[in-house]
Every structure is written in C-alpha cells, then in structure tokens.
C-alpha cells in the first residue's frame, strides 16, 4: 500500500474516533439530561464547551506544529489525551463536572484536525488533494462518529448506563495512537500549489487575512460548523420530544447522518477536483437546507424522512473543502497548519460555541423548532458567500490556463 493511502486511512480512522467521542455526549444527552435534570440551555452549553476549547487548541496547536515541525508527536499526545478525557466524562455526576470534562476534551482534540490535514496536504498530489483531504476528514468521522456512534452508544446506554458508554468510547483512541506511532512519518514540507511562492515565504500569519479565500472560508466555516452542531445537538431532542420517536428510532435516524457524510466524503471532494471548489461548495451548501426543512415539515414515514436527511446531510462534504483544501491551496506550505487552525478555530468558536448556546436559549423561551430554522439559515448564508470564492482547484486552473498558452 502506498504511504499516501496508508496515511489517509490511519488519520481518517483516528479522526473517526475523535468524532465518536465528540458526538457521544449528543447521542447520550437524552439519557444524561433525564438523569441530571438538564435544561435546553444547559444542553446547548455542553455542546458549546468542547467547541470553544477545540477552537483555541486547534489554532495554537496548528501554529506550534508549524514552528516545531513535530506534527507526529503532537498528534500522538493529543489522541491519547482525548481518550482519557472520554473516561473522565463517564464519571461526571453534575452539569459542572460534565461541562469541565468537555472543555478538557476540546483542548485535547483541537490540534488533531489541522495537524492531520497538513500531513495529508503535504503528501497529496495536486489532482488528488481535495479528494484525499475530504476522505481523511469526513469518511471516518462520519462512519464512526455519526453512523456507528448513535447505534452503539445508545444501545450500551439502554443496556447499562450512559457512564459505561463513555468508558467504552475512550478505548479505540488509545489503539489508534499506537497505529500513528507505527505508520505515520514526519513530512518534508514542500510547495502545495501556485500560491506557494518564495515571495510570500516570510509573511506573518496576519497576512493570511489579505487572501479573500481565507476570510471567506472563515465566515463559511462559522456557518457550516453551526449548521452541523445544531443538527447534532437538537435533532435527537426534536425526534423524541416533538416527533415522538423512540430512542431506538432516534438512534437510527441520527446514524443516517453518518452514512450520508461517509458516502459524500468521497463524492463532494472528488467532484470539486473536477468541477471546481466554488461550484461544488455553492450547490451542496444549498442542499443542506433539506435537513431542517424535512424534519420540520415532512409528515411521511420515517424511512422517507431518513432518505431526505441522507440527501440533505451531503452538505457536510463541503466542510473539508472550506476548512482544509481551499485554505491549503491558498496559503504557502509552511503556514498550512496555522491557516487551517485559524479557519477551524473561528468556525468552532462562533459556529460551534455561539450557535448551540443561542439555540438552546431560544428553544427554552420559544420552541425546539427555532434551532432548526437557525440551521437552515446557516446553510443559505454559506452558499451565498461561496459565490465570491476564488477558484483554487488545480484542474480548473489548468483548464483556464490552456487557451492562454495556446495563443
């Protein structure tokens, strides 16, 4: 097996278990909230806690990795740490205890994605970068974190307790840390694309904001992280409390999100390599409106609802493009992990922290429909902003350059 392929799968599965642990609290929340008497506002704050520290750790962890070039060591330490934090979540017995453990987990998990994506970016050929980074970020995280997690964790919680579910969730990360030690190499930094020119080699990270794609990706990441976190946090409650599905039905419907994202982790980035980043981001972000729209207004069978949600969750396939591929093709190679940490960090702070906290507050005062309206609005905003992206896909740039060279 080629090293490039092995790297993608080791890091992709590792990130899958990152999301298995991150999403565990959402899928177990109906059990936790009943046991610890949480309000909707407290549910939103629990979802926000991890996003806040994830964002800060993602930026500073990525910047530290760029400065020291010790990406592998940082990755191994972070994976071991988040696994231990899952065990701590299992012993929490109050809102404050669980809130604190989720803050710690965010610190541990934050550096993993920017460091992993920088490793993949360095090892990927130009024509495969979007595909490789999409598979690394979305396939494992959604197959394990969104598809398998609700089925496994809800079943464990029903058979035992939610505490035991957290204990079990922490084990796979320790195994993946061993795989990283064995199979991942420290990369040799090289230019990623036409933007990686020697003239920019000495620029400060603040200079990144002069690139239009960087600040557009930051704002779109805020919108799409909010879109995703609102779905994770409030769909389980809406399914059970408003649509009156059983916990088992809820877990199956939530697992559809993982199946969709795993499937479209190949489709969306692959299409972007051929059709262009901008076109694909616009189209699939708009499709993201289908998820809240179907849950709010579709009255057919649960099977038909699952099909609509499967289609709508394809918008998750744009996340690695916004948070990885487009910034990495815009910024010089030596700043890739820092750039990705900036985009992911801002998305997590404002989208992952602010949106669920605000949604929980409005749900307590109005209804559980409000978070889903917010989710739809986020998808529309992201699609509108994508209209202004500067195309970075190497294949599209080559096609544009060919007529000029022929003249």
For each predicted feature, which ranges?
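Helix-loop-helix hairpin linking two adjacent transmembrane segments in secondary transporters
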Residues: 136, 140-182
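Extracytoplasmic gate region of multi-pass secondary transporters
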Residues: 25-26, 213-262, 324
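Cytoplasmic helix-loop-helix junction between adjacent transmembrane helices
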Residues: 101-141
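Helix-breaking motifs and short loop linkers at transmembrane-helix boundaries and internal kinks
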Residues: 37, 69, 91-97, 244, ...
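C-terminal membrane-cytosol helix-exit motif in multi-pass small-molecule transporters
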Residues: 171-193, 385-390
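C-terminal transmembrane helical hairpin of 12-TM major facilitator-type secondary transporters
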Residues: 278-323
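Juxtamembrane intracellular "pre-TM" segments in multi-pass secondary transporters
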Residues: 1, 187-218
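Conserved MFS/SLC helix-loop-helix module at the cytosolic interface between two early adjacent transmembrane helices
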Residues: 56-93, 272-278
